[in-house]
Regions:
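Long, small/polar-residue-biased beta-strand-and-loop interaction regions
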Residues: 1-168
Length: 168
C-alpha cells in the first residue's frame, strides 16, 4: 500500500504541538501557532537591526504506513528571494533531532543557511526512516528575517517549500 506522508508544523513548548500544514502551507509570522493567518500576525519592519518571525519547526509524519519504508527526505526552494537585501528565509542545513520551544529571535537550531540557495541542485537532507504510522522525521527549522531596509507593505510574493522522499 502507498504511504501517506504529511508535513507537520510543531509549535508550543518543545515544539510538541503538531498540526498538519500540508494543505495550508508553511506560514512565517509573529506568533507561534499553525492557524493564525499571516496578515493577522505580521513581522514589523524594525527601525534598526533585524526582526524575526517565530521559528517554524517542521517534520514529516507517516499517517499510512508504507509497504517497506520512506527515506531520503529532502527540502528545497525555487531560488527566488523575497526582498533581496531586505528580508530572507533561513533554514537549518544539518540535523535537528530534538524540538525546543520556537523563538522570535535569531534561530540557533542547527547550522543556518539562506533558503534561497537551497535549490533543486542543492537540496537539504532531512533524516528519517519511516516504516509505520506515526513515525516522524527529524526537524526542518525555517525562519523569516526582516531587515530595517525592507519596504513598507505586505509581502505578496511567496516562496515555495518543496519536498520529496523515496518510498521503497
Amino acid at each position: 500500500m502507498a504511504a501517506t506522508i504529511v508535513l507537520m508544523k510543531c509549535t508550543s513548548a518543545t515544539a510538541a504541538e503538531e498540526t498538519d500544514v500540508t494543505a495550508v502551507g508553511v506560514r512565517l509570522k509573529s506568533v507561534d501557532d499553525a492557524t493564525t493567518a499571516p496578515a493577522s500576525a505580521p513581522i514589523t519592519i524594525p527601525a534598526a537591526d533585524t526582526a524575526y518571525s517565530y521559528e517554524t519547526w517542521l517534520r514529516f509524519k507517516c499517517t499510512v504506513a508504507p509497504d517497506n519504508q520512506c527515506t531520503n527526505f529532502q527540502v528545497w526552494s525555487l531560488g527566488t528571494a523575497i526582498q533581496t537585501g531586505a528580508a530572507k528565509i533561513t533554514i537549518n542545513s544539518d540535523a535537528v533531532t530534538a524540538g525546543v520551544t520556537p523563538v522570535n529571535t535569531v534561530s540557533s537550531a542547527g547550522t543556518r543557511t539562506d533558503f534561497v540557495v537551497s535549490t533543486a541542485g542543492a537540496k537539504i537532507a532531512v533524516a528519517g526512516t519511516l516504516t509505520s504510522a506515526d513515525d516522524e522525521s527529524e526537524f526542518v527549522v525555517v525562519q523569516l528575517e526582516v531587515y530595517s531596509s525592507a519596504t513598507q507593505g505586505n509581502v505578496t510574493q511567496s516562496n515555495e517549500f518543496n519536498y520529496s522522499y523515496d518510498e521503497n
